[in-house]
Design a protein with these regions (language model features):
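Short, polar/acidic, helix-capping and beta-turn segments at strand->helix junctions
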Residues: 1-127
């Protein structure tokens, strides 16, 4: 089975040794995606804005791997403050209101960069 690696240009990809997304067959897995724009943390911006940026990066990776946003079947939203889940949910709902993938919101202690408030993982199945 062929394996396609997708990079978003994050400086952490070569440092840690991971891909933004990996496609094997019809499956696309998107790594935990932080609010990084042009190789730098997009901060200080709020949780809603960070979530929107993460979702844009996730969508771009899925599209680059030959999928569509509509092919996303699962998302995992990691937050440093679960009491603010509605801010992230608003951004998530704007993208996925009609697609409605399986979704989990989880609180974590912190991320690599303390300015990050959210990271998002996704799985897609290309029809």
């Amino acid at each position: 089975m062929s394996r396609q690696l997708i990079s978003s240009g994050s400086p952490f990809e070569p440092q840690i040794g991971f891909s933004r997304a990996v496609r094997t067959g019809s499956r696309i897995e998107v790594s935990g995606t932080a609010p990084i724009r042009d190789g730098k943390t997009a901060a200080p911006i709020g949780l809603y804005e960070q979530t929107k940026l993460c979702l844009e990066i996730v969508a771009a990776a899925v599209i680059e791997a030959g999928g569509r946003v509509e092919d996303i079947v699962r998302t995992r939203v990691f937050l440093t403050d679960i009491s603010r889940w509605e801010e992230a949910a608003r951004a998530h709902g704007e993208v996925f209101r009609d697609i409605r993938p399986a979704c989990t919101f989880v609180e974590v202690k912190r991320f690599i960069n303390p300015q990050w408030l959210v990271e998002i993982e996704a799985s897609a199945e290309v029809a």
